[in-house]
Amino acid sequence: MNITLLKSKIHRANVTEARLDYVGSISIDEKLLQASGILEYEKVQVVNVNNGARFETYTIATQEEGVVCLNGAAARLAEVGDKVIIMSYADFNEEEAKTFKPKVVFVDENNTATKITNYEKHGAIF
């Protein structure tokens, strides 16, 4: 049996752009993708902290520093300045699931990684 677990998370990133007239996806600073272990074109779940919206899309890496841009229909689900949590998931067998720890990237107001951990303390946001 496989179990789906959180693999990676970029925590409370600031939306820097929202482009409705784009094909789709979420563009993310490639440095944040690398730090989190999220791959380009990987399916992600995005949660808007400001309005509670949750949606799935895929990532596009950008070389523009600090960019987190919602593209296409997703642009309707957040405004510039909203905080979002970007998460990817992976399937593990039961033995792998017992020891796996997700990678969590915390960012500042400029979407620069300030802390990278392989665990997350529940109840704390920083």
Curated annotation (Swiss-Prot):
Residues modified to Pyruvic acid (Ser): 25
Free-text cofactor note: Binds 1 pyruvoyl group covalently per subunit.
InterPro entries hit by this protein: Asp_de-COase-like_dom_sf, Asp_decarbox
Entries under Gene3D superfamilies matching the protein: 2.40.40.20
Modified how: Is synthesized initially as an inactive proenzyme, which is activated by self-cleavage at a specific serine bond to produce a beta-subunit with a hydroxyl group at its C-terminus and an alpha-subunit with a pyruvoyl group at its N-terminus.
Signal peptide: none
Known cofactor(s): pyruvate
Organism domain of life: Bacteria
Alphabetized UniProt keyword annotations: Autocatalytic cleavage, Cytoplasm, Decarboxylase, Lyase, Pantothenate biosynthesis, Pyruvate, Schiff base, Zymogen
Keyword Cytoplasm part of the UniProt annotation: yes
Active site (record annotation): 25 (schiff-base intermediate with substrate), 58 (proton donor)
Quaternary data: Heterooctamer of four alpha and four beta subunits.
Similarity-based family: Belongs to the PanD family.
Name the UniProt record assigns to this protein: Aspartate 1-decarboxylase
Species of provenance: Campylobacter jejuni subsp. jejuni serotype O:23/36 (strain 81-176)
Lineage summary: Bacteria, Pseudomonadati, Campylobacterota, Epsilonproteobacteria, Campylobacterales
